[in-house]
Curated annotation (Swiss-Prot):
Gene Ontology biological-process entries: translation
Ranges of biased composition (kind: Low complexity): 251-276
Protein name stated in the entry: Small ribosomal subunit protein uS2
Keyword Ribosomal protein: yes
Organism: Corynebacterium efficiens (strain DSM 44549 / YS-314 / AJ 12310 / JCM 11189 / NBRC 100395)
Length: 276
């Protein structure tokens, strides 16, 4: 079964690129034609690249990796949050903090601070002994941290790969990923640079429906990767426990059925000896 169909890509407007005056010449090979001053992306290539990105994400997650979803532009914010939360992956959909990857130790401290403030806010006497002004300042600090960091609250280490919507807008995230040799999977619109992406998906990174559809594809890959990982872990646990493999069962059953046949001649021989 196909990951996504040509009809779905067309309906979501994935084929619409930018105006011809706003393009990156490096994207020439992904462009099918030009229509009314707009570049049309070759969706046949998009389908091929989607399959490659899907398999990479699936295998990464199957081997215990995490995918960080990144998209801070308005058109991408909802899709990034919805799809990342659906499969339990971290996400950034408001603002990328410089050093979020390259200075993760400092970011971890800010995450710890956010959780402290959340615990304080949840406790009945969390603000006891503080003035209204102090309480207001702490509340503002918590809200500010949550806005930027809530999507990565459970991210204890740098991710295995990034899914990015609009590499131009998220150029800092792309640069940090490259510095740490973290693979980047991203939508490539006609104004993007394909050289900065490891697993490109040529398509429209401005339309809400397009970003939602492609983010759904990536989250589905994560979902399948998790299933594959669970199956591997279960198989390993069974092997460690010494349980027979399912394919061994028929052989054992066959051996049991054949056993009486081997004993029959022996019984007949005993009867013959007794008669003699």
């Amino acid at each position: 079964m196909a990951v996504v169909t040509m009809r779905e890509l067309l309906d979501a407007g994935v084929h619409f690129g930018h105006q011809t005056r706003r393009w990156n010449p490096k994207m020439r090979r992904f462009i099918f034609t030009e229509r009314n001053g707009i570049y049309i992306i070759d969706l046949q290539q998009t389908l091929t690249y989607i399959d490659q990105a899907f398999e990479f994400v699936k295998e990464t997650v199957a081997h215990g990796g995490t995918i960080l979803f990144v998209g801070t532009k308005k058109q991408a914010q909802e899709a990034v949050q919805v799809e990342a939360e659906r499969v339990g992956m971290p996400y950034v959909n408001h603002r990328w903090l410089g050093g979020m990857l390259t200075n993760f130790q400092t970011v971890s401290k800010r995450l710890h601070r956010m959780k402290e403030l959340q615990a304080m806010d949840a406790a009945e006497d969390g603000y006891e002994g503080r003035t209204k002004r102090e309480t207001l300042m702490l509340t503002r600090e918590r809200v500010k941290l949550e806005r930027v960091l809530s999507g990565i609250a459970d991210m204890s280490r740098i991710p295995s790969a990034l899914w990015i919507i609009d590499t131009n807008k998220e150029h800092i995230a792309v640069a940090e990923a490259h510095k740490l040799n973290i693979p980047v999977v991203a939508i490539l619109d006609t104004n993007c640079d394909p050289d900065v992406v490891d697993y490109p998906v040529p398509g429209n990174d401005d339309a809400i429906r397009a970003t939602a559809l492609l983010s759904r594809v990536i989250s589905t890959a994560v979902e399948e990767g998790k299933k594959a990982r669970e199956e591997r872990q279960l198989a390993a646990a069974r092997e460690a426990a010494g349980e027979p493999k399912s394919e061994d069962a028929p052989a054992e059953a066959a051996a049991t059925e054949e056993a009486p046949a081997t004993e029959a001649p022996a019984a007949e021989a005993q009867q013959e000896n007794a008669a003699e």
